[in-house]
Amino acid sequence: MAKKSLIYREKKRQKLEEKYHLIRRSSKKEISQIPSLSEKWKIHGKLQSPPRNSAPTRLHRRCFSTGRPRANYRDFGLSGHILREMVHACLLPGATRSSW
């Protein structure tokens, strides 16, 4: 189980990313449309003004059961070992059992 503080930190990053998503997207669109370099630098400065944690690259997928940040399956939202346990317990319909 991951520490609660790490899980809350990740949730805070998700909220920040949602808040600043439109600002980032609009300024990136402006940069691609403007031909002059000096104006691009000004818009680039605006792009750097939101907090670092609002960048989408700082987000990690976490297992919703344990909070583990590694070995996550996107389709299920689970880490590998929890996914295996749930498949063996027949809790995931349509998943076939396998041992590795």
Curated annotation (Swiss-Prot):
It is found in: Plastid, Chloroplast. GO terms for biological process: translation. Keywords: Chloroplast, Plastid, Ribonucleoprotein, Ribosomal protein, RNA-binding, rRNA-binding. One of its GO terms (molecular function) is structural constituent of ribosome. SUPFAM superfamilies: Glucocorticoid receptor-like (DNA-binding domain). The keyword RNA-binding applies. NCBIfam families: PRK08881.1. Part of the 30S ribosomal subunit. This is Small ribosomal subunit protein uS14c. The gene is rps14.
